[in-house]
From Swiss-Prot:
It comes from Escherichia coli O6:K15:H31 (strain 536 / UPEC). This is Aliphatic sulfonates import ATP-binding protein SsuB. PANTHER family: ALIPHATIC SULFONATES IMPORT ATP-BINDING PROTEIN SSUB (PTHR42788:SF17), TAURINE IMPORT ATP-BINDING PROTEIN-RELATED (PTHR42788). Its main location: membrane. Belongs to the ABC transporter superfamily. Aliphatic sulfonates importer (TC 3.A.1.17.2) family.
Amino acid sequence: MNTARLNQGTPLLLNAVSKHYAENIVLNQLDLHIPAGQFVAVVGRSGGGKSTLLRLLAGLETPTAGDVLAGTTPLAEIQDDTRMMFQDARLLPWKSVIDNVGLGLKGQWHDAARQALAAVGLVNRAGEWPAALSGGQKQRVALARALIHRPGLLLLDEPLGALDALTRLEMQDLIVSLWQEHGFTVLLVTHDVSEAVAMADRVLLIEEGKIGLDLTVDIPRPRRLGSVRLAELEAEVLQRVMQRGHSEQPIRRHG
């Protein structure tokens, strides 16, 4: 795997996307444009539609109505360019670390797998079993497994939620660093608002199946923990999440 910039990322366009489960409307005519290479965090209350949006983009669900596009192409037609990470690293315990990274690949993939492991700081653990790794190291392997496919779109479903505080900060820095290096588009679903504003270019609040807040994070990188501006943005998002009767309020865009 070339360590140079891999691609320009996948541009996303959702036009009036709805998702229903019987009478339950999870996404309701949602419109969204994400430019290629943007890092977007999605927050909101449980059941608001965050994970459903991610599953639609991953091709694990199909919309009830509307279009999900990569530019002008249906995203489903280029699904191989999309990779997803979960809270559970989902490593196969009977395969070595490097074999987990190269899972499903054919041909001469070992060099690329070693480079992907080097990118996440684990090339020296390539021959070990997953059971020997910590939770954070397992997530690094899962990240390497995504990187080897040179994704245009990386979907992150609470991938750091089970990690301790220090490991979580280290993984945040690693993900942002690799995003800056390789240029893929990122969509991160998280319940941690501080994580959202620390990592993303843009924070979306999804509530009752629609976008209730679209906030630009206008803070230069690298971002300093404890900065006043980060705290202000975090407080604004938290206040919005906690509001009641929000379904009648218009979308607010900043930046």
